[in-house]
Amino acid sequence: MTKPRTLYDKIWDEHLVHESADGSSLLYIDRHLVHEVTSPQAFEGLRLTGRTVRAPQKTLAVVDHNVPTTDRSKGIADHESRTQVEQLAINAREFGVEYFNELDPRQGVVHIIGPEQGFTLPGATIVCGDSHTSTHGAFGALAHGIGTSEVEHVLATQTLIQSKAKNMRVIVDGQPSEGVSAKDIVLAIIGEIGTAGGTGHVIEYAGEAIRALSMEGRMTVCNMSIEGGARAGLIAPDDKTFAFLKDRPKSPKGKAWDEAVAHWRTLHSDEGAHFDKEVRLDAASLPPIVTWGTSPEDVATINGEVPRVESAMSEAKRVSIARALDYMGLKGGEKITDISIDRVFIGSCTNGRLEDLRAAAKILAGKHIAAHVNGMVVPGSGLVKQQAEAEGLDVVFREAGFEWREPGCSMCLAMNPDRLEPGERCASTSNRNFEGRQGFKGRTHLVSPAMAAAAGVAGHFVDIRTWR
């Protein structure tokens, strides 16, 4: 009798080219996404050694990190950023790789355009020189970030040397209450397991609450797997997955589609499959979540308070809390709802999709941002922007006092003009709240799109379940 396998086991086995005595393995890579920041040296390595891209049709390039989200007809002011963008265009043209430049309507954040185009498929191995490649695991793909030297290796060979990770399952049962989103669920998971909880593992997300999520919500959860320490995150594909992918530009068509779906239906963990680690959460008991510190595990409920240094169980944790409080300009015992904000950022590969913008616009309709708050909405792609404008969401945002921007990574990270000033506090829908992540001495609180929008109007964090 065949040994029961996890979803991760199945995808790994299907892509295993060779297994070495030292435990390392050579995996075949189905899809490779590249952007302007981590690919220049990789392409230059190919050039210097006289190599070509082995499978150009399995590689897709896009600019996202460095591009401005304001008027692009003026170009990119920063020399290094401009050079990286120009070099990606040169490399894509020279090596025959499809490329979405900053003026292409399909351009956007790399982890949003992959699924949009049907480039992301269930059961595929997907890599990108970006840690949030785990996003694509929402489709039942084994997806993770790689370094620049590995980018070169994949370009040249369409393979990657890997060591197999352990299996971890996070089961989220119950139905979340109104106002509790996928972002709250994943922040609660990270708060439970910590930023090292998934280290050495690939996480499979399962349970009633996960199955109930839309594909956009599932992408939000898988996106932040890396913040939980995991190499990748997975959700078994189902009819929602297939409906999302059907008729996408790069999805299989006709008979090939039917055959693909038949195979994709086998991509689930078998009954009795072994998981090295398992965690359970009840979504029904979750309130909206806000991070208070400088790590994604520093979470609090909206009706909670900032932790006190003396509440920590270890000296190391006390030191960590004290440092975070000092950086964030907060005091232990301060109510989360008493924390005022200066900026709102709605966007990123975590929460820059159409569903996210709809959730924020629903909160903002007929309201206006607080006088002391500056807000920006950055669609995750040109296609998201087009659809949002077709639905009139841009009008809602503008009338509420928000800036409506062009697609890109934007204020998720301080690699472009969108950044916080020292001491500014931001309600952000992105994925990392590290020191300086959004700008030198900037203070980041991670929240859902609806929570960010409401905070912008109130000028401080509020419980959207009761706030009007």
Swiss-Prot record:
The keyword Iron applies. One of its GO terms (biological process) is L-leucine biosynthetic process. It catalyses: (2R,3S)-3-isopropylmalate = (2S)-2-isopropylmalate. GO terms for molecular function: 3-isopropylmalate dehydratase activity; 4 iron, 4 sulfur cluster binding; metal ion binding. CDD domains: IPMI. Pathway: Amino-acid biosynthesis; L-leucine biosynthesis; L-leucine from 3-methyl-2-oxobutanoate: step 2/4. PROSITE patterns: ACONITASE_1, ACONITASE_2. Keywords: 4Fe-4S, Amino-acid biosynthesis, Branched-chain amino acid biosynthesis, Iron, Iron-sulfur, Leucine biosynthesis, Lyase, Metal-binding. [4Fe-4S] cluster binds at residues 349, 409, 412. Its cofactor is [4Fe-4S] cluster. Heterodimer of LeuC and LeuD. PANTHER family: 3-ISOPROPYLMALATE DEHYDRATASE, HOMOACONITASE, MITOCHONDRIAL-RELATED. This is 3-isopropylmalate dehydratase large subunit. It comes from Methylocella silvestris (strain DSM 15510 / CIP 108128 / LMG 27833 / NCIMB 13906 / BL2).
